[in-house]
Amino acid sequence: MKLSTADSIFFFLPYEFINPIILLIPMATIIFAGRSNVGKSTLIYRLTGKKVRRGKRPGVTRKIIEIEWKNHKIIDMPGFGFMMGLPKEVQERIKDEIVHFIEDNAKNIDVAVLVVDGKAAPEIIKRWEKRGEIPIDVEFYQFLRELDIPTIVAVNKLDKIKNVQEVINFLAEKFEVPLSEIDKVFIPISAKFGDNIERLKNRIFEVIRERQGRRV
């Protein structure tokens, strides 16, 4: 699956900022990725008002889904990691498809939103490290950065986290994010209740402007 560079229109800005240069800026492409069952599809609904197939069973979203939102393209990637009811070889194939899609389209992706379960992530990361393995969330973040894709980490399930800053500091250490960048990279949210959604939305558009500004 290849993104079309022909899908090009300017992104929304206040009227007074629109000029001929802005008209040349391609439509923004935003990908949402994360483990299965971290609230990715719920978050997309909170941001766009558009429903994508979601449910309580891990791995409900198994195909790449594209959504048009305010003249931007939202891409909901299948959840990676454990997928209930699917053979391991199918899970690996889906993971490979995600990797190949992102590699093939890296230059056209303006921002990636990596959604993590703020309550479960620390324990999952510790468990993987105890086995001597690189945690999949950490590996995926590094993969996105190696492709030079600006990445925001949406730390979901804020309503279930006792010490939010402690969790963010832990993730920042594991993701190797400098102290000066923590507030730009990690946005604690609750997709279920809508907490901090506007902050995340503002950060997404800020990154888009920075990314596309370098292309002009």
Swiss-Prot record:
Binding-site list for Mg(2+): S41, T61
Function (record text): Necessary for normal cell division and for the maintenance of normal septation.
SUPFAM superfamilies (UniProt xref): P-loop containing nucleoside triphosphate hydrolases
Keywords on record: Cell cycle, Cell division, GTP-binding, Magnesium, Metal-binding, Nucleotide-binding, Septation
Name by which UniProt lists this protein: Probable GTP-binding protein EngB
Family: Belongs to the TRAFAC class TrmE-Era-EngA-EngB-Septin-like GTPase superfamily. EngB GTPase family.
Protein species of origin: Pyrococcus horikoshii (strain ATCC 700860 / DSM 12428 / JCM 9974 / NBRC 100139 / OT-3)
MF-aspect GO terms: GTP binding; metal ion binding
Biological process terms in GO annotation: cell division
Cofactor requirement: Mg(2+)
Binding of GTP, residues: 34-41, 59-63, 76-79, 156-159, 189-191
Residue ranges annotated for the EngB-type G domain, each copy included: 26-210
NCBIfam families: PRK04213.1, small_GTP
